[in-house]
Amino acid sequence: MALFKLGSVVATPGALQFCEQHKINPLLLLGRHMAGDWGDLSPHDVAANAHAIQHELRVFSSYKFGDDKVWVITEADRSSTCILLPDEY
């Protein structure tokens, strides 16, 4: 069940290449993100996301794959969601 809207979904070239190389389906990451499975976040960041959903603030997920991470960020106004690598932020 979706907790919030994603808006327009975009992905950086680096994130798409990483997902392709590691056989990661970006749609599964989006599904986890909007269902409240925010991956590898601290308890503080999990609480911040819960607050963000209630108060229409930015929602952030971080999924770890070995030593690498893929981030998913939904903007506060829910106009867009971006899949990216941390060094592309």
Which ranges hold each PLM region?
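Compact soluble domain cores
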Residues: 1-59
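Short, compact, well-ordered microdomains
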Residues: 56-89
